[in-house]
């Protein structure tokens, strides 16, 4: 059992320690030292360089508002990037890059996905084919995007089966296609049902959900 601390989202400071405490509280142990995702920056950059060398990356100059407005077009799947910056000319790219630089900003990097869809195998749902858009692989702040970091680190750790919540099933085709492009094995998946409130929404504190830390505070032990 290997453990990875996915800490590239700096806004979730302190969550890693809480996760370790939760695992210890239910008696789960792991082999070796946890892999710290932010310590793998060199490997993530190597993956980006490999994609760039094959023309599989392009700069994106869009704001969230730009994407939201363009994504409302009827031919764009809900939540997907509409490809605004994919086919810009070099002169257009230079102008947009200069405009961002004047604002002290950098462009994000997106995958020029070769296939608009990909099929994965899920242990619970069988063969699943989903759309793959030109998703972000490096954010505008220079931090590798989660999808890229997770795929690179899964390959490094030898992860061949991914078990997670059903709400992430739609992400599997994009991650599997990226693994294929990086020459990494594509894992199989098992997307399990979520714990839902009576309304059908995800269970939250307001619905009476409790954390393992809450239970520890109430005196529950590992055996409980």
Q: Where does each model-flagged region fall?
A:
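N-terminal Rossmann-like or analogous alpha/beta NTP/dinucleotide-binding catalytic cores
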Residues: 1-76, 155, 166-184, 217
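A conserved active-site cap/scaffold subdomain adjacent to cofactor or substrate pockets
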Residues: 219-221
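Active-site cores that bind ATP or allylic diphosphates and position pyrophosphate for catalysis
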Residues: 65-204, 211-216
């Amino acid at each position: 059992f290997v453990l990875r601390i996915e800490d590239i989202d700096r806004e979730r400071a302190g969550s890693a320690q809480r996760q370790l405490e939760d695992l210890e509280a239910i008696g789960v142990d792991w082999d070796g030292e946890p892999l710290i995702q932010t310590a793998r920056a060199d490997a993530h950059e190597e993956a980006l360089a490999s994609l760039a060398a094959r023309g599989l990356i392009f700069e994106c100059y869009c704001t969230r508002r730009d994407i939201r407005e363009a994504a409302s077009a009827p031919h764009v799947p809900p939540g997907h990037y509409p490809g605004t910056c994919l086919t810009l000319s070099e002169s257009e790219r230079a102008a947009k890059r200069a405009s961002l630089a004047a604002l002290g900003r950098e462009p994000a990097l997106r995958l020029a996905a070769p296939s608009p869809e990909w099929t994965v195998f899920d242990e619970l749902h069988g063969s699943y084919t989903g759309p793959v858009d030109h998703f972000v692989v490096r954010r505008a702040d220079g931090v590798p995007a989660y999808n890229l970091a997770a795929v690179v680190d899964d390959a490094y750790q030898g992860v061949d089966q991914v078990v997670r919540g059903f709400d992430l099933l739609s992400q599997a085709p994009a991650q599997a296609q990226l693994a294929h492009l990086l020459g990494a094995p594509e894992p199989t998946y098992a997307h399990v049902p979520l714990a839902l409130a009576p309304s059908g929404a995800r269970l939250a504190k307001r619905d009476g959900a409790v954390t393992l830390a809450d239970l520890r505070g109430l005196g529950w032990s590992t055996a409980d």
